């Protein structure tokens, strides 16, 4: 009898507790179906094209669409109000986290967090915090397009155009006479730059400029018996990375490039040190000093061979 009285008393206390009102943002119980009521896959409403991307693979446990039936709200946050039935005079609120400029962008940190909730464990974004792009308030969706089957950032032939939307000087350089084969689709920005953060300068994939260049130009790495100090120090002492009006991406055409260092103590007469109409004028120094990057020949101290 005492036990029953005790249980009754506990039950009464529980019932007497005031209900805690939950007025915070709510998830739409309909999940993605609630979104498809308005958003469909066609030219006018392409939002649900995300269904054809890796983000909507339900069989993948890490996919946003596989989590608690939340679908779109896995990224956009609890947005039941956005999908609610409204009266004609009511204004539809934006999703909790909005990536669309037409409805007003959410703060960069909120948009970043929506992506990093899943991607922070992946190595390529480990250095995002504090990177040049992060400090410039570039968000993931400033570059990536999620509601399309073909994200241009993941397409080697399209990626550069997306980067050029901010890096306009590099677009100009890439159209110069001498350039890396960007327009030809053979290389792209991320072959040299780690856009999510890097230990190297200028978001390079290597720790130094030279290490980055050597990933393709391995024959220039050395070590050489007779090294050329400016080359060993930095490829950019002689070359422009994104494009040049001079052959081989040179900053200045030969022989003038060489003379920027070798002018004062040249071992040649003035006809060679100050080329004019001589037969050496077109290629100048490299007519003889062909191994400008270094030489392993026993007699290659002058980089003649």
Locations of regions flagged by a protein language model:
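N-terminal secretory signal peptides that target proteins for export/translocation
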Residues: 1-2
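Bacterial N-terminal signal peptides
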Residues: 5-16
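Short sequence/structural segments immediately N-terminal
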Residues: 19-305
């Amino acid at each position: 009898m005492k036990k029953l009285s005790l249980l009754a008393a506990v039950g009464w206390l529980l019932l007497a507790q005031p209900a805690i009102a939950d007025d915070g943002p709510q998830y739409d119980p309909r999940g993605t179906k609630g979104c498809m009521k308005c958003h469909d896959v066609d030219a006018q409403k392409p939002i649900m094209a995300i269904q054809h991307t890796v983000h909507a693979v339900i069989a993948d446990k890490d996919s946003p669409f596989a989590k608690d039936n939340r679908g779109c709200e896995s990224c956009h946050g609890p947005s039941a109000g956005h999908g609610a039935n409204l009266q004609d005079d009511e204004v539809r609120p934006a999703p909790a986290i909005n990536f669309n400029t037409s409805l007003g962008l959410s703060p960069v940190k909120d948009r970043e967090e929506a992506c990093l909730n899943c991607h922070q464990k992946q190595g390529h974004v480990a250095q995002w915090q504090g990177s040049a792009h992060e400090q410039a308030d570039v968000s993931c969706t400033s570059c990536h397009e999620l509601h399309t089957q073909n994200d241009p950032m993941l397409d080697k032939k399209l990626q550069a155009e997306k980067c050029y939307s901010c890096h306009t000087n590099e677009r100009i350089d890439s159209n110069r006479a001498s350039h890396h084969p960007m327009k030809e689709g053979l290389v792209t920005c991320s072959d040299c730059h780690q856009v999510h953060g890097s230990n190297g300068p200028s978001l390079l994939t290597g720790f130094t400029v030279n290490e980055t260049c050597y990933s393709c130009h391995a024959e220039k790495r050395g070590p050489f018996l007779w090294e050329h100090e400016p080359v060993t120090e930095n490829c950019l002492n002689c070359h422009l990375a994104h494009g040049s009006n001079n052959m081989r991406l040179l900053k200045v055409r030969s022989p003038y490039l060489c003379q920027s260092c070798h002018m004062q103590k040249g071992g040649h007469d003035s006809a060679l040190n100050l080329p004019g109409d001589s037969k050496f004028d077109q290629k100048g120094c490299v007519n003889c000093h062909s191994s400008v990057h270094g030489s392993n020949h026993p007699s290659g101290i002058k980089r003649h061979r």
